[in-house]
């Protein structure tokens, strides 16, 4: 039986990246799902786009092999959003969808929020993830940096106004 995972702050831990070249690296916010892939949606109570996305996200449960589907309501878990700010995956807007490999964030979804696009994203990223898992040179801390938000989209709800004008635009809902 498959079901949606409802996660909270206790389901996440901070991890130090491996040392390399004396560079100061950000911490990694990991989830505790360590035996598979996971697709996690960070949402908020006052985000109408999150509410529109939830039924689509729920349809994915049990349909993607070796991938657990979960959600975190950052309105109920503000400490988690705050904790994430100094990590490789800061939660600066919702909805935010991240793909994890054995609990480590790997890729942020940046496409249109449709069921087909989410499935295609997981399929493509899973293929890349399997390649990485089999590659011993891959360091745990060498995940891609996730950049967020220019105020070019009216289809996301920024958690901090100051962050609404930095970085790259968030994904669209078209």
Curated annotation (Swiss-Prot):
Residues annotated as coiled-coil are none
Going by the entry's taxonomy, the superkingdom of the source organism is recorded as Viruses
- Residues making up the signal peptide according to the UniProt record: none
| Record-linked Gene3D superfamilies | Glutaredoxin
Q: Would you identify the family this protein belongs to, as annotated?
A: Belongs to the IIV-6 196R family.
Q: What is the protein name for this chain?
A: Uncharacterized protein 196R
What is the organism field in this record? Answer: Invertebrate iridescent virus 6 (IIV-6)
What lineage does UniProt assign to this protein's organism? Answer: Viruses, Varidnaviria, Bamfordvirae, Nucleocytoviricota, Megaviricetes
């Amino acid at each position: 039986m498959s079901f949606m995972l409802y996660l909270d702050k206790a389901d996440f831990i901070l991890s130090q990246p491996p040392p390399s070249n004396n560079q100061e690296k950000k911490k990694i916010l990991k989830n505790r799902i360590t035996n598979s892939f996971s697709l996690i949606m960070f949402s908020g109570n006052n985000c109408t786009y999150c509410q529109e996305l939830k039924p689509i996200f729920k349809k994915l449960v049990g349909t993607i092999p070796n991938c657990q589907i979960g959600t975190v309501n950052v309105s109920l878990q503000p400490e988690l959003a705050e904790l994430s700010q100094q990590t490789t995956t800061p939660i600066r807007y919702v909805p935010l969808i991240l793909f994890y490999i054995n609990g480590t964030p790997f890729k942020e979804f940046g496409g249109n929020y449709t069921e087909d696009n989410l499935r295609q994203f997981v399929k493509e990223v899973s293929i890349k993830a399997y390649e990485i898992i089999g590659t011993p040179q891959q360091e745990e801390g060498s995940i891609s940096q996730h950049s967020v938000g220019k105020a070019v989209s009216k289809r996301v709800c920024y958690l901090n106004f100051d962050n609404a004008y930095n970085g790259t635009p968030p994904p669209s809902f078209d």
